[in-house]
Amino acid sequence: MMNINEIKEILPHRYPFLLVDKVEEITESKVVAYKNVTINEPFFQGHFPDYPVMPGVLIVEALAQAGAIALLNKEEFKGKTPFFAGIDKVRFKKQVLPGDTLRLEVEIIKLRGSIGFGKATATVDGKIACSGEIMFAIG
C-alpha cells in the first residue's frame, strides 16, 4: 500500500497531471492503484462543461502512471524517469464521470532492458472502462 506522498517519491508527475491517488497492491509484476475522479479536475472545465466525462487519453495516462510505479519500484529503476512509449489494442467501454473511483490494474508482461510492456485495465464499480496494452521506456 502506498499513499500519495509515497507515490510522489516515485513518480515525477505533479498536479494537475498526477493521476494516481493511492496504490493498494504492488508486486514485481503487478500494480493495483486508484484515481478518485472529482468534479474539481481541471479537464472537466472543457470536457465537457455540460456533460463532464474524463478524457480517454487521461484514463490511459493514469494506467501508464500506475504501471510506471510498478517498474520504478524495481531497484534498478529507482530514481529514473518513466516515459510512455506506446499503446496497442486500447478500447473504451464505459464513461468515467465525476464521483467515480477509477481502479487501475497493470500487469507487467515483459521487460527487455529499460523497455517494459504491460496489460492494463481500468474499471469503475467492477465494470471495464478501458483496457489495452501499454509500453514504457525508462530513462
UniProtKB/Swiss-Prot annotation:
Enzyme Commission number: 4.2.1.59
Domain of life: Bacteria
GO molecular function: (3R)-hydroxyacyl-[acyl-carrier-protein] dehydratase activity
Catalysed reaction equations from the record: a (3R)-hydroxyacyl-[ACP] = a (2E)-enoyl-[ACP] + H2O
Top-level enzyme category: lyase
Keywords from the named record: Cytoplasm, Lipid A biosynthesis, Lipid biosynthesis, Lipid metabolism, Lyase
GO cellular component: cytoplasm; membrane
Known function: Involved in unsaturated fatty acids biosynthesis. Catalyzes the dehydration of short chain beta-hydroxyacyl-ACPs and long chain saturated and unsaturated beta-hydroxyacyl-ACPs.
Protein name: 3-hydroxyacyl-[acyl-carrier-protein] dehydratase FabZ
